[in-house]
């Protein structure tokens, strides 16, 4: 249990044994209460099979690099010229006194989106040949609360492995590789391998080609073929728009046994690279009674590529029709909370913490994810053949992928060049289902093969 902590005010390296004995007291004291208090009758036949011998160190020594990842890098989502990885976990801080503290076991502060991690934080300032990853990187105590998690550590491991290979091949130091003229080769190596670096593009060697495709899907309507769902919580339909594109009117099948008022808002993100719905663009209300199709119209034209939220307020007396159709880059999110890591559906800055206030919009994991049925008065061109060459491998600000028409029996792509090209290999990137909300396979997967 992560909250069985103690030792934050001690030297976790040289006083590890002292910490171990106190943690054992805590573990067996908790177990004694579970077994003998009478509050947990289901525990009568349970036993503890094993308790660790070595304390797990949440935080210990860190090295100092040529830069220090800090809170502002995370909250302000600062871009670094040498960005090589990303993080997304909250700044997750635990009280130094552990279980004996009067404070909650943890306090989490979220940024509005992913942040980048600079390569200069991944090597030692004082040792020419030492690369750092995991929980050793150059970061402040506060920033460490986010960058320490295992998925981020794994991403950094890939970066450091690639960097070590380049340093060895070119006989240079990590600090030399971090120079602006050199670090781009590391970034491009990572992107070619499928790594994600926010707001970085892969320089595509086939970008000089002309692309012809058999067809391209345009979003006009999603059929109502999956039943009805009451609006049990505030939710939103995510739709991307291209710069200069107007949001067409949208109609949805709704029903209510008695007359109800439904409040609908149009939201977007101040930072177009985010999907946090922190900026209100427009709102309107509609009167719902019986079962019919209702029309929503917002006069909005996008100033840049960005995602929009068409948000529906909670009203369990109103039901909306669902669709079985799933399309890349179009999905539902919910203004809800994950009770494991949050107590509210909105981040509240109730002190001088230097963080933002905003609503949490969460997708649901398969098979619990849903999508509203709807129709657009004018089709949206969400998937483009140009995206096959734009060097963006994730749905950042737009879908960044091509989708053929649903009735295209033999979808195909043709690349043409004015001159003969020589190629050693071709890499095809298929849909990796980035809309699927799965932090790690440990969460389980409803579509697992085995």
Region spans (language model):
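Aromatic, loop-rich ligand-recognition surfaces of beta-strand-rich domains
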Residues: 238, 244, 248-274, 327-329, ...
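Juxtadomain low-complexity/linker regions and immediately adjacent membrane-anchoring helices
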Residues: 198-218, 324-397, 432-448
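Short, conserved beta-strand segments of beta-strand-rich sandwich/propeller modules, principally
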Residues: 307-309, 425
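Trp- and acidic/polar-enriched beta-sheet ligand-binding modules for extracellular glycan
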Residues: 277-304, 313-316, 406-410, 432-450
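A broad, low-specificity signal marking well-ordered, structured residues that form hydrophobic/aromatic
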Residues: 46, 130-131, 308, 413-415, ...
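Long, low-complexity, Ser/Pro/Thr- and acidic-rich intrinsically disordered regulatory regions
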Residues: 250, 309-310
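Flavin (FAD/FMN)-binding glycine-rich loop and adjacent Rossmann-like elements that form
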Residues: 1-246, 257-290, 299, 312-349
